[in-house]
Design a protein with these regions (language model features):
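Membrane-interface extramembranous regions at the lipid-water interface
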Residues: 2-73, 94-123, 130-164, 169, ...
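Interfacial helix-start motif at the membrane-water boundary
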Residues: 67-88
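Alpha-helical transmembrane segments of integral membrane proteins
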Residues: 84-91, 196, 200
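Membrane-interface transmembrane-helix boundary segments in multi-pass integral membrane proteins
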Residues: 188-198
Length: 233
């Protein structure tokens, strides 16, 4: 009775230039959710300001460099706004690190030059007008080069649309308001702020799903290329 032995075939091909991305993706996902939680918290404070109503002494910023003393609710809003800023910085650091990795991996997998030069991973977020499409473009290009022929997930476009909407209608691309000005807006017209916060929370959640989808597609492609084939003999 003969025994059947498993004999390894030729070694699987190696893909040079790949960078580990799973841990970066997990950290980025949690950072996105943390940033979303920060916007939920700030929305709660904006509702509290709106329901409390503006004090008889007027808004905190009274013009011509004059600022009245803040009450306790306004002081706490400053703290919440600071915490939101911290979560956004943390999220930006992890997100850009993840973008670099998926972009580099897409080059390693496709052996093609990326559509956008490396400096756009940073500058694409801060240059006016360019920041309306380049970050999404970098991710979309990395996805298409990683898994050619596969349709771009709808969550990529949904995430980006929500991000741009939230920034444009709230405190980002159009408005450059201080915390005192935001307090004044919460007193006099809170709804645009709440729409912005809701969009940013939705962008954080869809961003979390987007990072998972892009990373999963890339890691599946890597696994299919580097799997060790075996033959029975």
């Amino acid at each position: 009775m003969s025994e059947q032995k498993t004999i390894p075939t030729a070694p699987a091909p190696q893909v040079h230039g790949l960078r580990p991305v799973e841990t970066a993706a997990r950290l980025t996902g949690w950072a996105l959710l943390l940033a979303g939680l920060g916007h939920v918290l700030r929305a709660v404070w904006e509702i509290r300001l709106w329901t409390a109503g503006e004090p008889a002494s007027g808004p905190p910023d009274q013009g011509e460099g004059v600022h009245r003393p803040l009450n306790s609710l306004e002081n706490s809003y400053h703290l919440v706004t600071f915490l939101v800023g911290v979560t956004m910085v943390i999220c930006a650091v992890f997100f850009i690190s993840w973008m670099w990795r998926v972009r580099d991996n897409s080059v390693a997998l496709s052996r093609e030059r990326p559509k956008y030069a490396g400096f756009w991973v940073y500058l694409g977020w801060v240059l006016p007008v360019a920041n309306l499409w380049i970050p999404r473009g970098v991710i979309a290009d990395a996805y298409r080069k990683s898994v050619p022929g596969r349709k771009l997930p709808a969550v990529v476009t949904a995430w980006w649309a929500l991000w741009v909407f939230g920034m444009a209608c709230g405190t980002g691309l159009i408005y450059r308001d201080s915390a005192d000005k935001l307090i004044e807006r919460a007193y006099t017209g809170v709804w645009p702020l709440l729409f912005s916060e809701a969009a940013m929370v939705a962008a954080a959640v869809t961003g979390f799903l987007m990072v998972r989808a892009v990373t999963a597609a890339q890691t599946e492609r890597v696994a299919s290329l580097t799997a060790q084939p075996r033959a029975e003999g």
